[in-house]
Amino acid sequence: MVAMIAYGAMWAVFSATGPRIAHERAIGWTRQLRVTPLRPASALSGKLVTALAAALPAMVLVAVTAVASHHVQLSAAQWLAMLAAMWAGVLPLALLGLAIGYLAADEIAFPLTMALYFALGALGGLWMPPSVMPHAMQDIGQALPSDAVAELGWRITGGQASVPKAVLVLAAWTLGSATAALLAYRRHTIRSAP
């Protein structure tokens, strides 16, 4: 259940950012926005909030399905803590999607996003338990945000509150992805300046 929640949230934030922004760039929408009074920070934060909002229905639907069809039982506090932590955990993935959207061409953004989605899902332990993977893949997976998001959920549902490694991994990816997104946006605005 936790892996599917992470996988669904990851796709939601990627599909709301990368390919969509690349398409908006291709049709000239981002250039149109720059001639309006809308500040760039507001435009970027709007994209980010939209991506995070898109993740919520996917997460909640998987949780409801887990309860309805598999009789998963957690306390209300565990459900809220798990969903909130995992929702916050997809922030670096949404930022990474922003970077892809502002860097990749329209025809490349979707395949690139899909490849990244599958790689993060497989290597991050969302397709199969990380413990059955070769050690090299486990080591790679532990450094990925997809594994860290799932680790938050697994720890919370297992009654373990301590998740410092997952939080550190997500913090590092958030910093790196935010930097990449800002640099990509600046590059885009410089290249498409009138």
Which residues fall in each region the model found?
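Long, hydrophobic alpha-helical segments
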Residues: 1-19
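Hydrophobic/aromatic residues in alpha-helical transmembrane segments
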Residues: 13-17, 61, 95-96, 119, ...
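Alpha-helical transmembrane segments and their short interhelical loops
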Residues: 40-113, 163-171, 176-181
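Transmembrane helix segments
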Residues: 104-143
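Short hydrophobic, aromatic-rich alpha-helical segments embedded in or entering the lipid bilayer
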Residues: 128-167
